[in-house]
Design a protein with these regions (language model features):
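Compositionally biased amphipathic helical and low-complexity segments enriched in hydrophobic
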Residues: 5, 32-36, 342, 350, ...
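Extracellular low-complexity, Gly/Ser/Thr-rich intrinsically disordered linkers
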Residues: 384-483
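Post-cleavage N-terminal segment of exported redox proteins
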Residues: 2-96, 218-223, 227-302, 306, ...
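Short glycine/threonine-rich turn/loop motifs
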Residues: 53-213, 282-423, 483
Length: 483
């Protein structure tokens, strides 16, 4: 008798090995890991691309990368003057620029006060340069830089009169603006809809001349500078100079028969040299390269740039415009306007030994056409900040000699005036001591950081001021070739 089994018979095809059940799970994990790896690699690749080319990624990412790396997420192409060989007139102007024999002392040339090695500004830290017949007389103001002056507009007050053939005189424009409240100047803000009548443009600290030719002529007869006694004296020196033959070649054989014309053509030649020689306007600073996406700023420089443009902090860009124009011209770091800042009186200046003497800028004493327009008294031209970190003397009276001092004055003038001004006989701080009391209302107290009161917290910390100074150093051009 056959014994029957009680074990169930296996079903064909229904049996699975024990380890084979986890294989799909493993394959899924491998696929997931592969996808993660692809995402990571793609992310790293995109991150590397963003770091290298922040301008090629979406704005929020580019801004973040720029803040992290110091790159410019929005590079631009700057428009510069074409570089070409100097004309014959400019080459003559170059010789004139460096010729000390054109001065009464025989020791002072244009380059003595406008040194090429110092951004065509003063070569030392003197409050004002020495000149005169024996080079012992102190000047009235420190020389501004001659760089980038080819873009300086003519002096005017208020909006341009356009094609009006009967445009009012400067004095008439000034008189019509009397009593008009000066607009607040804020970094990055659009100008007010109604045009403001403000002085702007011109050369020298008070804008008293408009052309480089006029500017070059100014020191020739100034008794504390080149100190020549007359135009005839200068013309005679030009006729006796080793380059006199170039005058006759360029301006005709009778050029020396008219003394006024001789000197005028000489000053024109100096002006052409300043316009044509690229060392006067190279636009090759670190900031220019950063604007074009060719260089990166350090973290301190980048923080300084943000503070420079911050209307609630330094607000520097309210007057020292930092962005390129729509035409691609590099920023000039000035709005060409005039401000009354109330810097302390410099008692080291010879002219200030007279307690009744006040240098009032636009309304005198060196220009007289606006002396009755008292709303402009104590206003001086806003200079470009390009190459300012190479200077050793600041403001119209040379009272400060470092950027640290300048920043401290801006930051603490109103919150701690005793830090800068002396005390009067009554024991009170003599604020704005270089401006007569009747003109002190012209001093800027509305634009940051001057919009603080005594005892308020200053707009900037010490570290923030150091960062701004670090940024200002990026505005220095590369040194020009040695003359």
């Amino acid at each position: 008798m056959t014994e029957l089994s009680t074990s169930p018979a296996p079903s064909s095809g229904s049996s699975t090995p024990a380890g084979s059940a986890v294989q799909p799970v493993r394959r899924g994990r491998r696929l997931l890991l592969s996808l993660v790896a692809v995402v990571v690699v793609a992310g790293l690749g995109f991150g590397a691309f963003a770091l290298a080319f922040p301008a090629q990624v979406p704005d929020p990412i580019g801004e973040a990368v720029g803040n992290l790396t110091g790159a410019n997420p929005h590079p631009v192409t700057l428009t510069r003057l074409p570089v070409a060989p100097l004309s014959a007139v400019a080459l003559l102007g170059k010789q004139l620029f460096f010729d000390p024999k054109l001065s009464a002392s025989g020791q002072q040339s244009c380059a003595s006060c406008h040194s090429p090695a110092h951004a065509y500004g003063p070569p030392n830290d003197l409050d004002a340069q020495l000149g005169g017949t024996s080079m012992a007389l102190q000047g009235y103001r420190p020389p501004p830089s001659l760089m980038y002056l080819y873009r300086q507009p003519n002096f005017m007050i208020g909006p341009d009169q356009g094609e009006n053939d009967d445009a009012p005189s400067v004095a008439q424009l000034a008189a019509s603006s009397a009593g008009v409240v000066k607009a607040q100047k804020t970094a990055g803000a659009a100008p007010p809809a109604a045009p403001q009548m403000v002085p702007q443009g011109g050369l020298f600290w008070d804008g008293r001349v408009d052309t480089l030719q006029q500017q070059a002529f100014g020191p020739l007869l100034n008794p504390v500078e080149m100190a020549n006694t007359s135009i005839d004296t200068v013309a005679q020196k030009l006729e006796n100079a080793p380059y006199s033959k170039q005058f006759t070649q360029l301006f005709g054989p009778r050029i020396f028969s008219d003394k006024q014309l001789t000197v005028s053509e000489a000053m024109f030649a100096i002006a052409r040299y300043q316009v044509e020689d690229p060392s006067f306007h190279p636009y090759n600073s670190k900031y220019d390269r950063w604007l074009e996406g060719k260089e990166r700023l350090s973290q301190a420089e980048l923080r300084g740039l943000h503070l420079f443009n911050d209307p609630n902090k330094a607000n520097c860009a309210g007057c020292h415009l930092s962005k390129p124009g729509s035409d691609g011209l590099p920023p000039m770091f000035t709005d060409y306007q005039y401000e009354a800042l109330g810097v302390p009186r410099n008692r080291a200046l010879a002219q200030n030994r007279d307690p009744k003497f006040f240098d009032l800028g636009v309304c005198g004493p060196f220009r007289q056409d606006l002396k009755d327009q008292t709303q402009y008294c104590a206003m001086f031209l806003t200079p470009t900040l390009r190459n300012s970190a190479t200077r050793q003397v600041f403001f119209h009276n040379g009272v400060y000699h470092t950027l640290d001092q300048v920043m401290s004055f801006y930051n603490d003038r109103n919150t701690n005036p005793g830090k800068f001004y002396p005390k009067g006989a009554d024991g009170k701080v003599d604020k704005y001591d270089d401006i007569p009391a009747k003109y002190q209302k012209n001093v800027d107290v509305t634009d940051a950081p001057f919009d603080r009161n005594f005892g308020d917290k200053p707009a900037m910390t010490d570290q923030e001021m150091r960062d701004i100074i670090a940024f200002v150093h990026t505005l220095n051009d590369d040194p020009p070739p040695t003359h």
